[in-house]
Design a protein with these regions (language model features):
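Helix-to-beta-strand junctions that scaffold the AdoMet/dcAdoMet cofactor pocket
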Residues: 38-39, 101-102, 115-117
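Conserved class I S-adenosyl-L-methionine
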Residues: 122-149
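A short acidic, Gly/Pro-enriched loop at the edge of an enzyme's catalytic core
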Residues: 81-91
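A short SAM/SAH-binding and catalytic strip from SAM-dependent methyltransferases
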Residues: 89-103
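Class I SAM-dependent methyltransferase SAM/SAH-binding core
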Residues: 21, 27-80
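Core SAM-dependent methyltransferase catalytic element
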Residues: 159-177
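A short glycine-rich, Lys/Arg-flanked "PGG" loop and its adjoining helix->strand segment in the class I
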Residues: 105-120
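Conserved alpha-helix/loop element of class I SAM-dependent methyltransferases that forms part
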Residues: 1-18
Length: 177
């Protein structure tokens, strides 16, 4: 079984009205599900470097009548690359992105910058290459390595179990527990 965004998001303690950044939003699958979770009082920032994906998200949001998703053209690996305000985000979602990030130090620093002091980060990524359906084996970021990376910016693993499927892992990190 591969990761199921709908199931994972249903398990997350994200409150109505929260501000969420979906980093590396792709086609917006996670963004749209998160928009429903946070309700009209909340906001989802779909951050993506590929402009054609942002247009696709905007068109789909319009077609679905979703008004609380804002697209942001972003280089998520750079300081200020998300263009979001300092300490403005309750939840950061990093789904199937970590293995693609080249500048991981810049990436986690940008997450730390935008995350509120009480904020949380969900990381869902490949636990293995899985016969080349996932990333190349050399690009897989193991869960233990992700924990070390996020510990470098003061985030710690939360005691919440996320079932992300048999070929993925899911970890919630918090600034303060």
């Amino acid at each position: 079984m591969f990761s199921d965004p709908q199931k994972i998001i249903a398990e997350l303690p994200i409150p109505i009205g929260a501000s969420v950044a979906d980093l590396g939003a792709g086609v917006g699958t996670w963004s749209f599900l998160l928009a429903k979770k946070v309700g009209a009082a909340g906001k989802v920032y779909a951050c993506e470097v590929q402009k054609d994906m942002l247009v696709r998200i905007e068109n789909e949001a319009h077609a679905l009548g979703i008004s609380n998703v804002q697209t942001v053209w972003s280089n998520i690996e750079n300081h200020m690359g998300t263009k979001l305000r300092d300490q403005s985000i309750d939840w950061v979602i990093v789904a199937n992105v970590l293995f693609q990030v080249e500048d991981r130090t810049g990436f986690i620093k940008e997450i730390s910058r935008i995350l509120k002091p009480s904020g949380s980060v969900l990381v869902v990524d490949w636990s293995e290459s899985y016969g080349n359906l996932g990333p190349h084996e050399k690009d897989v970021v193991r869960a233990s390595d992700a924990e070390k990376m996020f510990a470098e910016i003061g985030l710690v693993k939360a005691p919440i179990i996320i079932n992300a499927g048999s070929h993925h892992y899911g970890i919630i990190f918090k600034k303060h527990i």
